[in-house]
Amino acid sequence: MTARRILVTSALPYANGQIHIGHLVEYIQTDIWVRFQRMMGNEVYYVGADDTHGTPVMLRAEKEGITPKQLIDRVWTEHKRDFDSFLVSFDNYYSTDAEENRELCEKIYLALKADDLIAEREVEQFYDPVKNMFLPDRFIKGECPKCGAKDQYGDSCEVCGTTYVPTDLKNPYSVVSGATPVRKSSTHFFFKLSDPRCETFLREWVADLAQPEAANKMQEWLGSEGEASTLSDWDISRDAPYFGFEIPGAPGKYFYVWLDAPIGYYASFKNLAEKKGIDFDAWVGPHSTAEQYHFIGKDILYFHTLFWPAMLRFSGYRTPTNVFAHGFLTVDGAKMSKSRGTFITAQSYIDTGMNPEWLRYYFAAKLNASMEDLDLNLDDFIARVNSDLIGKYVNIASRAAGFLVKRFEGKVDEAALAHPLLKQLREAAPQVAQLYEAREYSKALRLVMELTDTVNAFVDTEKPWELAKDEAKRSALHAACSVSLEAFRLLTVYLKPVVPTVAAGVERFLNVEPLDWRAIDKQLSASSPVQAYQHLMTRVDAKQVDALLAANRESLQATAPAAGAAAAASIEPIADTITIDDFAKIDLRVAKIVECQKVEGSSKLLQLTLDLGEGRTRNVFSGIQSAYTPEQLVGKLTVVVANLAPRKMKFGVSEGMVLAASAADEKANPGLYILEPHSGAVPGMRIG
């Protein structure tokens, strides 16, 4: 069979912070798939890079008193260290602040411009008169134009969920300097995604997406065929000062970070190609027969399934074969939290003495091909790793290897290796391979653990420790140990993409060549004696997990005594007096949260399905994702403004407002708290 040629990427981590376990979901998912493809004999290149450009990097470097280049170089070293620690096997890990990336950005931009897909338009933005810079959405705060909530970002309100443009904010201020921004016009460059050519191409391209959720979301963005396109042109430029690449022929204008970041995939591969003599154009040209896959989080699906393929298609490059999106990580059913210690950094995990392959295995046991979220339940983590990897898998080798080495010089009984058990294990290979290929890791490991149970049942039946007591049963002991270790070798082939370091240890003590998928059709040989058994993995100790949480838990003790005073200081002044008639216009009702889910493309909103006792349910968007997971809210009672006029939002129509409490200065006193009526209240009850 002809080997496949595959280019694989993971999303680029931003060069403004540490790698944490939420990031690692994606890199471990990708790495398992890449390692499996290598074991299958395919030509695979896995490339990545740090995403280095943009205002946040520029401002952080300024705050630290260093240059942006010094900052991104330091962060690159930290990120590379963390990926190496978790056995993420990049063929090349690079930076978007590289000459290859500059050249590719300019080439793609000029090709799009030549094809009349770049437009220039005047844009009015907020400008910081102190810092002399235009302000991105996240660097402006003010009062929500809809509900009046203070300290809301420039793109949406976390209290009521309304989305808006920054210039809609009331009493805006610059997060950078605190100054009141002024409105200022500037010429910006847009990629014309609304061009009919882009729409036609994207409708064809979406048909090949593997994930139904991704295809459905694309259809939402594209709208029904024959209707007016819902696609909007994309602002690809930013004004100086900006850390990034200047746009050719446009002094003081820079490529927006989201343009040069995905192009960074190609820049990293080009850097690798130049070092290894790979024909770059043969892999990424429009007629390439290679495959190209992007593993990403579902929050950046929009960029990778609309802008990125359209940019490639109309600038003379091949388009992705597929995009694979995964869900978000929760810990013990809740968002990662610094106060609880569950915002776990990669480095703290390693520093605590935790084995990276424990986490690789646990994530693999939870991952599938969908975009659903996954939860790291710490008690389950301890139990599953200790049960599956230690109690079941490693236990096989520890029960058989010693006898084979001591009694038989490590030489297997080759005649015994015709045992039906081994045939059963080999017959599972196509199914295991199919599940790895489809990214259904949880199903693959479930099957492997079922096979492991079968092997352990064989060992329990044969009882080599009993056979060893009777010299007359020497041949039976030899056969039992030989079959057990050959079974262990086959199981190791199946687990190698997930636990490569353990697999390397197995290869050493079994005295075999590095295991790939073809090794399934081979077997242990008496001419290559098994070596003395070396311990492969230790059990997870609950005390280690406690220490990990403690290492990541922010100390609240120092701030606790002043918490009350701080909260009091942040209380907003009481609003102007209203009459009872004014209040009577507001219809507050008890509502039951029937369903709840995160809103695709929003880091703030939750979509709630509410029962107000009307005989139907209502759809309400609420900006409380920072405080609650969907699982925490389903089944709860809350309070809703029931007679608020429905409003059309970016993500749908909201038919009410969930009431929540927060401090006036959420930065100083973070936290959102939905209102809950006492037990006994039922949906539909009026509050007054």
UniProtKB/Swiss-Prot annotation:
It is found in: Cytoplasm. Keywords: Aminoacyl-tRNA synthetase, ATP-binding, Cytoplasm, Ligase, Metal-binding, Nucleotide-binding, Protein biosynthesis, RNA-binding, tRNA-binding, Zinc. It catalyses: tRNA(Met) + L-methionine + ATP = L-methionyl-tRNA(Met) + AMP + diphosphate. A motif ('KMSKS' region) lies at residues 335-339. GO terms for biological process: methionyl-tRNA aminoacylation. Residues 582-688 form the tRNA-binding domain. Its main location: cytoplasm. CDD domains: Anticodon_Ia_Met, MetRS_core, tRNA_bind_EcMetRS_like. One of its GO terms (molecular function) is tRNA binding. ATP binds at K338. One of its GO terms (cellular component) is cytosol. Zn(2+) binds at C144, C147, C157, C160. Binds 1 zinc ion per subunit. Its cofactor is Zn(2+). Signal peptide: none annotated. Its EC number is 6.1.1.10. SUPFAM superfamilies: Anticodon-binding domain of a subclass of class I aminoacyl-tRNA synthetases, Methionyl-tRNA synthetase (MetRS), Zn-domain, Nucleic acid-binding proteins, Nucleotidylyl transferase. A motif ('HIGH' region) lies at residues 13-23. Pfam families: Anticodon_3, tRNA-synt_1g, tRNA_bind. Homodimer. Belongs to the class-I aminoacyl-tRNA synthetase family. MetG type 1 subfamily. Is required not only for elongation of protein synthesis but also for the initiation of all mRNA translation through initiator tRNA(fMet) aminoacylation. This is Methionine--tRNA ligase. It comes from Cupriavidus pinatubonensis (strain JMP 134 / LMG 1197) (Cupriavidus necator (strain JMP 134)). The gene is metG.
